[in-house]
Amino acid sequence: KWGFISDVQGNRTKWIILGMIILALGANLAALCIPLYSLNTTAATLLSILAYVLIGLGVGASGTSLLALLATHTAQRRRAAAATITWLMMIFGIALTATIVGKLLDPYSVQRLIKIVFGLTMLTILLTGVVTLNIERGLERVKKNTNQSQSFILGLKIIWSNSQTKRFTIFVFLSMTAYFMQELILEPYSGLVFSFTPGQSTSLSGMQNGGVFLGMLAVGIACTGFKFGALKNWVSAGCMGSCISLILIALAGQSPEIAPLVPLVFGLGFFNGMFAVAAIGSMMSLASQNNDKREEI
C-alpha cells in the first residue's frame, strides 16, 4: 500500500525517509523489550512482535521505494549495474555495521546494547535525510507516464492480470524463502557438525557474504560491461548453483573431518549473489516495461 501511494504521489524520497524512521522505531522497541522479559514475558513478547512488524514495514516502505526510484530513473542498459551497486552497498553496510557494533558491544550489557541501537538508528536516519536531499529534483523519468491516479485495488488487479508478473512474483517468493533459509541453520550446523567455535561460525558468515559480493559484481560486469547473458539466464544459473551448493554442504556433514565446508559456503554465497542481483535487475526491468506508473506495485 505504501508503495502504491508513492507511485501516485511520485515522491519516493519521502517514503524512503519515513520507512527508515519506522524501522528505527521498531529496532529501538525490540532492544527495549529485552530487559522487559525478566518482568513480564507476555507483554515483552507482544511488544517484540509489534517491534518486528514495524521493522518489516519500515524496510518495505524504504527499500521498495528505493528500488522503484532506480527503476523509474535508470535506463534499461544500466539496470543490472544499478542493482549491482545497490546490493553491493547493502552487503558492505551489513559487514561494516556488524564489525563496528560487535566491537562496541564488548563487554556486553543490555544497557550498552540499547544505547548502541539508539545511536545507530539516529545516525542512519540522519544519513538517509542527507543523501536523499533534493535527489529527485534533477532526475528525469526513463519513460513518460499517463496514469496518474487510480485505486490501489484496481492497480493491483491490473498488475496481477499480467501472467509474466504473476509468475515472477511467485518465483521471487519461493526463491527468497530458500535464499534466507540457510541463515537459520548454517552457523548452528557448522558448530554442531563441524565443531566450529562461535568466532569461526561468524567468520563463516563473513565468507558467505564475500561470495555474495563477488557474485553480484560478476553479474553486473558481465551484463553491463560485456553484454554477456540475459538477466533471466543469470537468475536461473544462480538458483541452480545455490541448490547444488546447499546439497554439497548437506552431504559434507557425512564426513566433517575432511569436507571443505568454507569453500562450499563461499560458493553458496557466490551463487546467491548471482541470483539476487539478476533477480533485482529483472524486477526493475519488468516494473518499467510498460508506460504506466506502477513501478512500486
What positions do the PLM features span?
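Helix-to-loop junctions at the C-terminal end of transmembrane segments
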Residues: 1-11, 105, 215-231
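C-terminal ends and interior cores of transmembrane alpha-helices
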Residues: 18-42, 239-256
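Glycine-rich segments within core transmembrane alpha-helices of 12-TM secondary carriers
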Residues: 80-105, 208
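Juxtamembrane intracellular "pre-TM" segments in multi-pass secondary transporters
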Residues: 138-169, 193
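Transmembrane alpha-helices of Major Facilitator/SLC transporters
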Residues: 201-226, 242-245
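C-terminal transmembrane helical hairpin of 12-TM major facilitator-type secondary transporters
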Residues: 232-279
